[in-house]
Swiss-Prot record:
InterPro entries: Cytidine_deaminase-like, FdhD. The active site is at C121 (cysteine persulfide intermediate). Belongs to the FdhD family. It comes from Salmonella typhi. Coiled coil: none annotated. Required for formate dehydrogenase (FDH) activity. Acts as a sulfur carrier protein that transfers sulfur from IscS to the molybdenum cofactor prior to its insertion into FDH. Keywords: Cytoplasm, Molybdenum cofactor biosynthesis. It is found in: Cytoplasm. Mo-bis(molybdopterin guanine dinucleotide) binds at F260, C261, K262, P263, G264, R265. The keyword Cytoplasm applies. One of its GO terms (molecular function) is sulfur carrier activity. This is Sulfur carrier protein FdhD. GO terms for cellular component: cytoplasm. One of its GO terms (biological process) is Mo-molybdopterin cofactor biosynthetic process.
Amino acid sequence: MNNILSEEVLNVTDFTTSRQLTLWKREDLQSSQLDDVAEEVPVALVYNGISHVVMMASPKDLTHFAMGFSLSEGIIDSPREIYGMDVVPSCNGLEVQIDLSSRRFMGLKARRRALAGRTGCGVCGVEQLNDIGKPVQPLPFSQTFNLGNLDRALKHLNDFQPTGKLTGCTHAAAWVMPSGELAGGHEDVGRHVALDKLLGRRATEGEEWRQGAALVSSRASYEMVQKSAMCGVEILFAVSAATTLAVDVAERCNLTLVGFCKPGRATIYTHPQRLIAD
């Protein structure tokens, strides 16, 4: 297997396709021209030779995605339980081939047996209703964030959406340092995938990524809250709103959930004690 974080560095245009489109403007006649459209491909996560899940995603930063998904879905507890990854083409998309520890692979196979024979998928990957919104353990209260620094993060969030700037078709997830500086970020056509990419990268970065908060360009659904909590993120900022279930899960797992983040304002849904207001 290749090194866990090995992936070819590509240009942003590698993740878009030019298509002949018809544009309409009130003041003009219809016209046909080339425009950029974001790539979306099926990505299979294959653990020790067995395909576990197929997700639709942007075809970049896929090792980060696989790491984040494995952590946020409870397949692993530590990056050390993945020994290596390869991203390879398949007939209809891409595969991330993951070399998983034997102990974790046995647990994954047990989960697959528990799901076998069931039909329907209201909440994919959840085995029973009681499992919804139940993180491994409540989060500690070890982080604080000065809301006066949020404006800086919001100003630069688009810097991590180069494909989005071309196509208007991606979500972003970024890691906000206590100063408001963005340490890094990822984009994807899927908001959950963008967050998984960020969580996977955070798990393999240094100690400086332990402090701060996650910022997403989308709404905050319960899955976003649960994924964050599973990876030890104590504060989640969302540009859009939160759902009722997201608020309930955040309250239960001690996560500070903040929505409608705009310059100079925000809506704090849960656990405001982590936040400092100048």
